[in-house]
């Protein structure tokens, strides 16, 4: 296993870091992995710190910014007796209450580090949004499922503005109103006619300003097209410090609910399909979807495989 070392100096911006401060060092092991992929160098990269004890909120954010992955997750002891561990999730810009690929990746670490007994098939993670249920489906490597938090449907968005913001023609869009749907992170879902339009779409900050007001919470934008196997999609998150995300579990639950609502996929309990994401950016990801609830709106599970990549130690001079 490749092992790396990163040294970061944390100091007050108004004070110089003196040599004597170098005696106060804390070391923190971290793991990197590719989530929603069965092979390395695909899927969505993630860093997980198995023991974040003693790392402050500010330093967690600094670490996430330094690593500059879509998200970095930090594991700590739970405050709830029914949860295996507590998880904090940070993008390079902010902390998230919930995110899909960090939840799947952290669950893989929980299994590998034996935070739960070997052979455990179900457990709960404590996240800021609340308890998140995890289910493990045995395979050559485990297929890990998360129960999507409660989904809410928000405002509709003008198709002309959506097309303009994404660099498309309004005729490229499906005849279904784009809509904000949330399972913790509000996501504007825009359906287009085929994969070519998905790959042509792009979102800059100027385009984002057409889609939301400044007082709204940060918005993800998902562009998708229905496929024989489910969906083909891209997700843009400039407000989260992520221009394009290779795999977005927190947006895939809302996508599934949106597709069921608009009769693009069956809402019958037990329905399974996939969302293929990240292809355009060379990080092909496969997100598995299973519908377990009435009309597919609740009881949605998102599943994926995890490929471990590297292990390292971060030394913080504090």
Predicted features and spans:
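Active-site proximal loop and beta-alpha junction motif in alpha/beta enzyme cores
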Residues: 19-98, 104-318
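Short, Lys/Arg-enriched N-terminal segments with co-localized hydrophobic residues
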Residues: 3-21
